[in-house]
Amino acid sequence: MKILTIILSLFIITVANADIKGSVLSKASDKISEYTIGLIPGEGYTEASIDLREGFKPDYSILAVRELLKIDSGNIFTQFSLFNTEQANEEKIIGNFGLGTRKLFDDNTVLAGFNAFVDNDFSETNRRASIGFELRNAVLDFHSNIYEGLQDSDDERVLNGWDYRLASQVPYLHWSKIFINHYEWDGVLRDDIKGTKMGSEMILTRSLNFEIAYDDKDKKGLEDEWYAKILFVHPPRDNGSTAKDGISQVAFKDNKDMSGELLSKVKRNNKIMIEFKGSATVSRAD
């Protein structure tokens, strides 16, 4: 799987740096993103993704952000998603539903927001809630979330925890960001779980994003791993840099209007972290 991830990332980066306009990759990503909007009605951000991870089957998800109400220099929105994931060799279906508000400051160049979510495991009775905060501009993103278990199943215990994510635009590559994502989960029957993800997000085409990262876990029984994520988004971007723009002459973007980010997705861990009762195992950290 590690070899597959590396090959996949190199392949996509190589293709994306070519002249993608009119290429098979660009046309295919536009078609897939166009199809996703038909699955969820309404205007806003829609995303379909494939998550490739060492030692696990691929996870597939669909996510949408929709505006509920416009407010002065901001909005109130909802975000919901549905996806499959594998835990202890068992396939699970997880759903998330959240409400959030965002507001623009400093001539619309700074975005701040708060959100609250409920996560539900449709395969078990596991439920979790979270609250989150975000602060963003054209170059830097900061997200932080606190998670609290609401209900356990017979043989699984939902863990409480928190995380933060700090991302920065890569100098001269306006279509790429690097990020660090630290998380901690409070063990009940076993030790706490801590870890840090380090990786990169890339906007390859108007409709195709790619993320690759290394998940460094500080917990016996949970192996460190690479993961790669392919994301098809809709609607296609009307402006902004993509990989075909290559290297810019300017290190960082100018202060841009963040109004276009009011309906971007909330960055959080949508998967429910659990501990298995009566055994010495825990689920993967994401």
Residues covered by each model-derived region:
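Solvent-exposed loop/turn segments connecting transmembrane beta-strands
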Residues: 50-60, 83-95, 120-128, 152-159, ...
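Intrinsically disordered low-complexity regions specifically enriched for long asparagine
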Residues: 14-20, 61-64
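Feature captures outer-membrane beta-barrel proteins of Gram-negative bacteria and organelles
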Residues: 34-36, 58-71, 93-107, 129-146, ...
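Flexible, glycine-rich linker and terminal segments associated
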Residues: 19-39, 150-179, 183-190, 202-286
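Transmembrane beta-barrel domains of Gram-negative outer membranes and organellar outer membranes
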Residues: 29-33, 41-90, 95
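Transmembrane beta-strand segments that form the barrel wall of outer-membrane beta-barrel proteins
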Residues: 43-52, 74-86, 110-121, 131, ...
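Classical Sec-dependent N-terminal signal peptides that target proteins to the secretory pathway
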Residues: 1-18
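Bacterial N-terminal signal peptides that target proteins for export
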Residues: 1-4, 65, 115
